[in-house]
Regions:
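Mature extracytoplasmic enzyme cores
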Residues: 1-170
């Protein structure tokens, strides 16, 4: 209805991409339709240590800095327990479920298929309802920035290291 009235008055209508901030989860529809899109760990939180603790707990990745190089000691962390050095311990962080995310958590925007599911869920609905006005009364659709909170950490997705090595060769 709004698009038709705007057309009659010569007013442009800009469509917001979805339900709420941040963009990418379509008000909970993306995680509902694509369960693999959330809670695989969306970040890696860094803890630096000069002595590797005896109880490493939920460490996902452990790097030892030696001079100007890095050594991945994740597989043999227990052998280094109690030793001193320049250790970088990373733990997975997870978005919490909440009402803001439609009862789900935020999605992993780096996971293949998430963007496609978002477009299918949101843009196809707009196209069906008012697609004949795209480029006319509706000059465009705008989006919010994604939620990539990783203060003190790294943005992460399950195949990050594999893709990095494939792209950069190391």
């Amino acid at each position: 209805h709004a698009t038709e009235v705007a057309r009659q008055y010569g007013i442009s209508v800009w469509i917001y991409d979805e339900n709420s901030y941040p963009s990418g989860f379509a008000g909970g529809h993306v995680p509902a339709d694509y369960p693999d899109s959330f809670n695989q760990g969306q970040g890696l939180e860094l803890e630096r240590a000069t002595q590797l603790p005896e109880d490493i707990g939920s460490v996902f990745l452990c790097l030892l800095r030696e001079n100007d190089s890095w050594k991945d000691i994740t597989e043999e962390m227990t052998e280094y327990a109690g030793e001193t050095g320049d250790f970088y311990l990373y733990r997975k962080t997870y978005y919490e479920k909440g009402d803001w995310y439609g009862g789900f958590s935020y999605v992993d925007l780096l996971l293949p298929g998430v963007t496609e599911k978002f477009i299918e869920t949101t843009m196809r609905g707009y196209e069906k309802q008012v697609g004949n006005q795209f480029g006319k009364t509706i000059p465009g659709i705008f989006t919010d920035e994604p939620n990539i909170v990783t203060s003190g950490g790294l943005r992460w997705t399950p195949d990050l290291f594999e893709q990095f090595e494939k792209r950069w060769g190391y």
